[in-house]
Amino acid sequence: MNTDKEIVERSRSAPATFGELYDRHAPDIYRYAARRAGDFAAEDVMAETFLVAFEGRAGFDGPAEAVRPWLFGIATNLLRRHHRAEARMLRALARNGGRGHSADGLDAVDAKVDADGDRSRIGAALHALAPIEREAILLYAWADLTYDGIATATGVPIGTVRSRINRARRKLRADLGFALFDDMDSDHGRTAPAPHNA
């Protein structure tokens, strides 16, 4: 199996091979965008992410493990444009307790919380975070990026990522009265993506 970086490099002379990268990562980019801005915006963000990546592939020179964070960084930049859609989705989630929205990222905590009452509180608490804190915690929790990957995606030092995630966790804990996303790692800095259930 080719690494992501090998695919990017080969696509410079054989553009059709870039489709392998799309096949490998498009579902994750779509899910991340849908969780942040809803299904309607997710299609556009996913498509535009891969268009921007394809057009910028000649300039990519990072390590193999940086391709996924590079793609999520592009998606995150595009989502900034869709911030209003994300804000509307989180406000709607807060208003209606999550009914009528996919909000897949909240499903992981359903075992800990009452879906009708706390899902709306979670949406409101996420919306209340500063955008840079919300971006960091959602890249961590919903895009499953490491702290290094988030630093690559957002273009900030890893220490800044740690601070933003720590602040977001503290604010969420204070607003909600329980820990959200705290049990995802125990060493205050995921070094590898969390294992996916098949």
Label for each model-derived stretch:
Residues 124-135, 143-160, 174:
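Helix-turn-helix DNA-binding module
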Residues 55-62, 73-97, 107, 115, ...:
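Arg/Lys-rich amphipathic alpha helix in sigma70-family domain 2
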Residues 25, 164-167, 171:
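Residues within the DNA-recognition helix of helix-turn-helix
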Residues 2, 98-127, 195-196:
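Acidic, proline/glycine-rich intrinsically disordered inter-domain spacer in sigma factors
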Residues 91, 95-98, 152-153, 170-198:
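C-terminal edge and immediately downstream basic/flexible tail or linker adjoining helix-turn-helix-like DNA-binding
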Residues 22-40, 55-56, 126, 178:
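Amphipathic, Lys/Arg- and hydrophobic-enriched alpha-helical face
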